[in-house]
């Protein structure tokens, strides 16, 4: 395929990479145009790797950004050696479809900690290795990065899509993602160093706090507002934080808006001018799933329409920079989340759900 040939040439052009083709035989052709009226504002957080037809449909429907799980443990599976091949393929595909990556960087390799959810802040060598990895990632994929320079040699017509924002970790107020227990002070240190590293390479990039759900259901969890306040208590955080991530999962629209409002109020209270970014929001569409986030398909569509519409109406007031829906397609990935398997905008057969129609009504995109 054309993409496979391009990735093969990138293996030669970008030092230190071994790049396979990314699995599709489709000729990517010209860059897809993002449909609708909002460019990269609306995004998707997929729970599986979408195929090219998915990406084309997303883009036509007004999805202009894509939440990328940038896993340190995947890239540095062997201590001291980076394998970027999976992400070279992913960033290339997104650029071919005109979509902006929004990476959240997470996952400590087993060479440094026994669990990927144990942060690298406990050990100076691990913390240095994190900084080295993050620097390498931004040098590769950031503005004027090595990857985009190599792509331009092979395909000068392809428009680069470097991340506008880098999100540091995921839900660190939950012990699911921050073992053994959430620690706002340690997260502040992780964030501050990460911000310094990223801006040292790409001064125009935004560095965003991890999206947090206000009240995680895990042992030792910390309310996201309390957690964020303790992070801001550290010297230099207002300069380090460019945007604040929010995961306002809630059973109804009022609770969604309440979480966003409380986060915005805290940012204003501490005197920061950081924007907000909803990096995950969603509901399931199987009411038998046993969760207050499990609705009917019609209710899922209505909640999407009302919550995203209300947030859009208050975009300037809230300093809202983006909204990312979880997720694209109904698929059971085996995670311990009863409603997640039906959180898609399309069903398992990729047929439109009421939520996809509501989404494209909002964006002005094409649902087909």
Walk through the language-model features, giving the residues of each.
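Aromatic-rich peripheral "rim/lid" segments of glycoside hydrolase catalytic domains that contact
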Residues: 162-167, 172, 288-303, 313-368
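Hydrophobic faces of well-ordered beta-strands that scaffold small-molecule active sites
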Residues: 40-46, 66-68, 101-105, 164-168, ...
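Substrate-binding cleft and catalytic face of glycoside hydrolase catalytic domains
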Residues: 58-221, 236-237
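Bacterial signal peptide processing site
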Residues: 23-25
């Amino acid at each position: 395929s054309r993409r496979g040939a391009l990735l093969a040439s990138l293996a030669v052009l970008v030092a230190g990479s071994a790049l396979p083709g990314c699995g599709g035989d489709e000729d990517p052709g010209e860059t897809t145009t993002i449909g609708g009226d909002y460019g990269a504002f609306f995004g998707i957080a997929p729970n599986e790797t979408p195929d090219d037809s998915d990406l084309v449909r997303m883009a036509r429907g007004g999805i202009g950004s894509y939440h990328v799980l940038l896993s340190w443990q995947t890239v540095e599976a062997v201590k001291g050696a980076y394998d970027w091949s999976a992400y070279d393929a992913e960033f290339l595909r997104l650029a071919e479809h005109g979509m902006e990556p929004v990476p959240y960087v997470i996952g400590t390799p087993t060479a440094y900690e026994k669990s990927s959810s144990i942060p690298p802040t406990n050990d100076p060598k691990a913390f240095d290795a994190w900084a080295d990895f993050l620097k390498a990632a931004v040098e590769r994929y950031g503005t004027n990065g090595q990857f985009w320079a190599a792509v331009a040699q092979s395909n000068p017509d392809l428009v680069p899509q470097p991340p506008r924002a880098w999100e540091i970790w995921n839900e660190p107020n939950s012990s699911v993602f921050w073992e053994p227990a959430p620690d706002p002070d340690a997260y502040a240190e992780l964030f501050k160093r990460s911000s310094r590293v990223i801006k040292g390479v790409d001064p125009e990039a935004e560095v965003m706090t991890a999206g947090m759900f206000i009240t995680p259901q895990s042992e030792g969890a910390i309310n996201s507002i309390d957690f964020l306040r303790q992070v801001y208590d550290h010297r230099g955080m207002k300069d380090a934080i460019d945007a604040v991530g929010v995961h306002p999962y809630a059973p109804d629209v009022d609770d969604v808006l309440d979480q966003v409002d409380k986060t915005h109020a805290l940012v204003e209270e501490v005197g920061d001018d950081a924007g907000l970014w909803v990096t995950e929001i969603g509901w399931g569409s199987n009411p038998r799933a046993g969760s207050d986030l499990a609705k009917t398909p019609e209710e899922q569509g209505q909640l999407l329409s009302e919550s995203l519409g209300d947030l859009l109406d208050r975009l300037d007031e809230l300093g809202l920079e983006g909204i990312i829906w979880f997720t694209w397609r109904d698929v059971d990935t085996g995670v311990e989340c009863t409603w997640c398997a039906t959180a898609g905008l399309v069903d398992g057969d990729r047929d439109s759900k009421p939520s996809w129609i509501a989404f494209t009504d909002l964006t002005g995109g094409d649902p087909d």
